[in-house]
Amino acid sequence: MSLMLEPNPTQIKEERIYAEMGLTDEEFAMVEKILGRLPNYTETGLFSVMWSEHCSYKNSKPVLRKFPTTGERVLQGPGEGAGIVDIGDNQAVVFKMESHNHPSAIEPYQGAATGVGGIIRDVFSMGARPVALLNSLRFGELQSPRVKYLFEEVVAGIAGYGNCIGIPTVGGEVQFDPCYEGNPLVNAMCVGLINHEDIKKGQAHGAGNTVMYVGASTGRDGIHGATFASEELSESSEAKRPAVQVGDPFMEKLLIEACLELIQSDALVGIQDMGAAGLTSSSAEMASKAGMGIEMYLDDVPQRETGMTPYEMMLSESQERMLIVVKKGREQEIVDLFEKYDLAAVTMGKVTEDKMLRLFHKGEKVAEVPADALAEEAPIYHKPSKEAAYFAEFQAMKMETPKVENYKETLFALLQQPTIASKEWVYDQYDYQVRTSTVVTPGSDAAVVRVRGTEKGLAMTTDCNSRYIYLDPEMGGKIAVAEAARNIVCSGGEPLAITDCLNFGNPEKPEIFWQIEKSVDGMSEACRTLQTPVIGGNVSMYNERSGEAVYPTPTVGMVGLVHDLKHVTTQEFKQAGDLVYVIGETKAEFGGSELQKMIHGKIFGQSPSIDLDVELKRQKQVLEAIQAGLVQSAHDVAEGGLAVAISESAIGAKGLGATVKLDGEATAALFAESQSRFVITVKRENKEAFEKVVEAIQVGEVTSTNEVTIHNEENEVLLTANVDEMRKAWKGAIPCLLK
């Protein structure tokens, strides 16, 4: 039996075995003090996963406290499986985003698939039916064979899981930069709907109540996954494939239906997903949140491998498992319910009053630790922070407009940059129409899903321009939230709240910690100004390979409320003769832009700037015009500037083009990436009414010529481009790079 091989408490201390599990000398001394004795092997394992950055946020908590987390509509902020926001009529939207970066770097298909599975469980553990999935992906340059492999496998993994489980993947974003070559980012978001009375918490109340294990059996996959996610990737990480879990979407589909039926039963007290740190986190957190303890008999854990030790069972991150607490005496009802779905439901313990997590195996007590010590009392570190050396240098640079010889060729080249190019190759692999509630499919500013039985819809998006955040973390943090809100507004939605996924390098490096602090400062300010509180999220640190960190990438997932589906607006032009308006001024801002990266092969200088009060004013005006029925199409101006935004609106339409006139220096007018700008089209008869509501400049009109023609203020033609040719270049870019 492998039990014989476990080191004893003295060996764990003297041979510093705890260090291999991720605990520091000081942390091990704290554990010894909490217990009043040396921990055994299982107990050391419990502390090592629960005190990892991934589970405890020990390095990021002081920064996360800056986020605004309350608001009129917020029913549940950070701290539970997912956040919840009221949408009226006794309904609420539940959503959360999480990362699965490290597993996806090692085993991309399963890493991405189980990332999707985990975030779905977070949402239905709150009592909500999952209705949509989104993702935000980062990879190196597609010229590299390894990157092509990671990209193809990650997309296949997301598709494989989401399509089988029957939840539409409706939106997302993909960006490519060399810094992600060895460390891709895979962030998955799930959105669910719930009635107020069905909201459930992951809390173990009521001494004597029964603790039950439901779902798939436990294997050795994913042991120490949380610890693995709290260290840098290296050559030896390849050997950690066992730390990557394997998902079964068909099992999860059954689990969703069983749990949603269970939630209607008054026998249920609390429910939580076994996510990172598996049984350890679910039991310790449920006990701690309720101010109770839990006693568990590990012989009763359904196991799919023989001879598993308590340590292995507690730390396994096998997928498709939930821990539930039910009223004493009602266990058989639960067993019967799960049996109907061919799922196991096993009694394995009870709730106690003494606040201890106590584990038994083969008649012996194998662990006894305070639940609060695991769930709440991890040390909190105030890491040293130091402004990155490059920042002052970039801020002092005198920025020059990139030299462009041929505007048309430059536009075509930009449309073929993988970050701008059509992502159809990606989303064509996703079933985005399953459940038949998708109103706006992938490819527009935000996806929209109808709320059945009402006239309402939910708009949703993921956004983050990591280049801006690298150049100026605080300004970039503001832009990430503002762009997400702009996308929601362009779709006809009122921004409600955000979930975030903070992807950074090693927080022990002062310059990385400075990036974390500053970007959170920027995001927090934007959330306050735009009234979109943070209702939950995830931190992913140590995204480095060979000491090189990824760009700071605090991804924003935002959900908005479309009050009436009549207001749903998309980015493509609708009919010839409509007037084209631009909202917002264009400045020669090229730092971190697609044009700068394309011409110079790198990014430098100052990021675009943003005034949040101006942003809010413009968003409110655009939303008011949309809700008044005055807007035909709306598109946010982002990567590639106005020329790309206008071209995208033409590409999305059939047989339409536009003739527009842009003032100012030509390269900036066409390609600068100034913030808070929109391209809007309006019916001619609504011109006056629209101009009363929105401060905008009419720049041209939609034509039936199938060409985009852009003039300068002297009326000289800067470029004329055939829309079919642009569409072909834009759609063909990613498939061509993958050949």
UniProtKB/Swiss-Prot annotation:
The active site is at residues 54, 100. Mg(2+) 2 binds at residues 122, 273. Keywords: ATP-binding, Cytoplasm, Ligase, Magnesium, Metal-binding, Nucleotide-binding, Purine biosynthesis. SUPFAM superfamilies: PurM C-terminal domain-like (SSF56042), PurM N-terminal domain-like (SSF55326). It catalyses: N(2)-formyl-N(1)-(5-phospho-beta-D-ribosyl)glycinamide + L-glutamine + ATP + H2O = 2-formamido-N(1)-(5-O-phospho-beta-D-ribosyl)acetamidine + L-glutamate + ADP + phosphate + H(+). Pathway: Purine metabolism; IMP biosynthesis via de novo pathway; 5-amino-1-(5-phospho-D-ribosyl)imidazole from N(2)-formyl-N(1)-(5-phospho-D-ribosyl)glycinamide: step 1/2. Substrate binds at residues 99-102, 121, 245, 317-319, 540. One of its GO terms (cellular component) is cytoplasm. Its main location: cytoplasm. Belongs to the FGAMS family. NCBIfam families: FGAM_synth_II, PRK01213.1. This is Phosphoribosylformylglycinamidine synthase subunit PurL. The gene is purL.
